[in-house]
């Protein structure tokens, strides 16, 4: 099955609740590639790449996040790129 790549923008109470670290752990467990970072507007942005089934599992996880997060929306956009591993990036 071909790989898919999505950019996610996650809104709500998603900073200061270990969202990014939890996403890195989840992505590694699912064998995904890409990155995640905080944005200055209080949201979290991620690019997720891998097998469609596993990427969809990550999107479902992103809608919930870790236990202390309160996710109000996840905007999903098609994306491109070629990534190795899943990285925590600096805020923008």
Curated annotation (Swiss-Prot):
Keyword list, A-Z: Hydrolase
Catalytic residues, chain numbering: 20, 38
Keyword Secreted: no
GO molecular function: acylphosphatase activity
Domain Acylphosphatase-like, first and last residues per copy: 5-90
Membrane-spanning residues: none
Keyword Flavoprotein included in the entry's annotation: no
Substrates-to-products reaction catalysed: an acyl phosphate + H2O = a carboxylate + phosphate + H(+)
Family designation: Belongs to the acylphosphatase family.
Protein name: Acylphosphatase
Species in which this protein is naturally found: Albidiferax ferrireducens (strain ATCC BAA-621 / DSM 15236 / T118) (Rhodoferax ferrireducens)
């Amino acid at each position: 099955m071909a790989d898919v790549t999505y950019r996610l923008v996650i809104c709500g109470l998603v900073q200061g609740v270990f969202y990014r670290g939890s996403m890195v752990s989840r992505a590694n467990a699912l064998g995904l590639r890409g990155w995640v970072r905080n944005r200055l507007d209080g949201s979290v942005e991620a690019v997720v790449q891998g097998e469609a089934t596993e990427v969809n599992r990550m999107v479902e996880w992103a809608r919930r996040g870790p236990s202390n997060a309160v996710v109000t929306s996840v905007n999903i956009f098609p994306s491109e790129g070629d990534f190795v591993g899943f990285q925590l990036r600096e805020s923008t």
